[in-house]
Amino acid sequence: MDASRKNRLKLIKNTMIKMEEQIVKSMIKAFTMLESLLVLGLVSILALGLSGSVQSTFSAVEEQIFFMEFEELYRETQKRSVASQQKTSLNLDGQMISNGSQKLTVPKGIQAPSGQSITFDRAGGNSSLAKVEFQTSKGAIRYQLYLGNGKIKRIKETKN
């Protein structure tokens, strides 16, 4: 073989080696992109799966906070009637509960009674309603209101 032919073969061999290296690099890049898409898909599925449980937990916490705030508003209204020595009312009107100076919004997951009013006499005793019932997705929360002394008791009834 002559020198020019050897040089050409060497040049072709070097070119083929470089092309193989580029093909391998391209395959690695494609594999890395495929891995990235796979990981992104798995993370998306996990995020969507967890968002439902987070949402239900948030709703449960929101319900608990609402009932604690309702009980506090009940006691505040009772204290106001004693302090002012006047009859005071706590009005339940669907999505809003109010005592004239304070308002409490009922969350979307809870159905509150509408058109009911709890009236406290000058001594702070309840002189109107015997019970108030709220409906939730898990059942009912009923407040037993003791006439005369103004005490309140929460009773939870779950759906079967």
Curated annotation (Swiss-Prot):
Main location: membrane
Induction of its expression: Part of the putative comGA-comGB-comGC-comGD-comGE-comGF-comGG operon.
Keyword annotations from UniProtKB, A to Z: Cell membrane, Competence, Fimbrium, Membrane, Transmembrane, Transmembrane helix
Subcellular location field: Cell membrane; Cell surface; Fimbrium
Entry's Gene Ontology cellular component terms: cell surface; pilus; plasma membrane
Domain of life according to the entry: Bacteria
Regions crossing the membrane: 30-50
NCBIfam families listed in its UniProt record: ComGD
Assembly with partners or alone: The transformation pili are flexible filaments, consisting mainly of the major pilin ComGC and smaller amounts of the minor pilins, including at least ComGD, ComGF and ComGG, and perhaps ComGE. Interacts with ComGE. Interacts with ComGF. Interacts with ComGG.
Name this protein carries in UniProt: Competence protein ComGD
Organism the protein comes from: Streptococcus pneumoniae (strain ATCC BAA-255 / R6)
Source lineage: Bacteria, Bacillati, Bacillota, Bacilli, Lactobacillales
